């Protein structure tokens, strides 16, 4: 709209009219209409237009918000704005769910018709678990801020129904929840947490006892549920011998016997040690199976299989003084205490390493050469180690010839009783003294031995690895000639 002043007269007159409103809006039909012949004041025109326009929009917004408003505590209703039922009264929606979990738990529990919610039957046990504390919570004035706006009942009715529910539940304390299925006990945890959040936070003096009362009975339900669910399948599986596995179905050992006998050839027996597995199983606590059964199927092979070579000893070797082989296998003592373990060259290195033996054997100072100052004394000590009182230097020298062929020792030419090691000193001592353990040399015989007790092949203990080779190249030096029988 535009006005032009020319000579004090209005150049153009434009009448201002309002648009006709729809007859359905009562408040909008009473809008002010300006006569068409009257000129509009330029100062009052924009405010009048804006006020009427905003009043029209605000009326629609208030109506739309009032129709579509959903209570904050009602979490299950989702308004459908595209349907024709979107502008109904919210009170009708609240009355459809009078027994929802957001109402009083005692009221929903006292009524026994089947509900779509599993929470109603669970709050009875949580409230009856400690009834005096629940009654004290429900006692505040009706105007307390923690009350839910969806509760359609009065405070007196709630307290009376709570007392009835508490008294009825206390009369049968152990029959309410023990007979239910497992799916019923999984609900109270969610129910208690969702129920305490709107009411426990609104009441300032009572949030701690209210949350403690509802959360305390809830955790035992899942624990009882697990015990009931896991025992039955295990006992059913344990009663079936064919489907049970060894060692995992409780203490039902008759069911696992079939699997044990099938695993006998896999774990219990080897080609070289036939009887190892049954010798070390009784300390584990198995009294039922006999030693001949393959008891490795019990599931204890983890503690037995890592060291079968160390502890497995053939039973027929437990005779005489060969028992010492089992002791040396564990490295509890020096390995030279075992009969047959100490070789002659290691014995000579041990004598040379001890300065107290310098009067009968010593280093010459030329590399790795050494001299037997008293060869008979060296032979006597070697006989003590081997429990051979008939040992002499003649027999000792024949044994040293094996090391010539193996490249360990050599005889120094032109000098009597002088020998030398051909390997490096570091390698010599590392091989002679494994794990830095010096041999414990014996000073006396273990028992008095006469020459009648010896047998023709008993001297094989001196050097069991090279005697077949020694008989070939040196037949004149037969061992029979050196003994008197």
Swiss-Prot record:
This is ETS translocation variant 4. Epididymis and brain. The gene is Etv4. One of its GO terms (molecular function) is sequence-specific DNA binding. The keyword Ubl conjugation applies. The modification Phosphoserine is found at residues 100, 139, 148, 215. One of its GO terms (cellular component) is nucleus. Pfam families: Ets, ETS_PEA3_N. It comes from Mus musculus. Residues 342-422 bind DNA. There is a cross-link at residues 95, 227, 261 (Glycyl lysine isopeptide (Lys-Gly) (interchain with G-Cter in SUMO)). Sumoylated; enhanced upon ERK/MAP kinase pathway activation it positively regulates the transcriptional activator capacity. Sumoylation at Lys-95 probably requires phosphorylation at Ser-100. Transiently polysumoylated and desumoylated by SENP1. Sumoylation is a prerequisite to polyubiquitination which in turn increases proteasomal-mediated degradation. Probably polyubiquitinated by RNF4 and deubiquitinated by USP2. Residues 158-171 have a biased composition (Low complexity). It is found in: Nucleus. One of its GO terms (biological process) is positive regulation of keratinocyte differentiation. Residues 79-114, 135-214 are annotated as: Disordered. There is a cross-link at residues 6, 138, 323 (Glycyl lysine isopeptide (Lys-Gly) (interchain with G-Cter in SUMO2)). Belongs to the ETS family. Transcriptional activator. May play a role in keratinocyte differentiation. Keywords: Activator, DNA-binding, Isopeptide bond, Nucleus, Phosphoprotein, Transcription, Transcription regulation, Ubl conjugation.
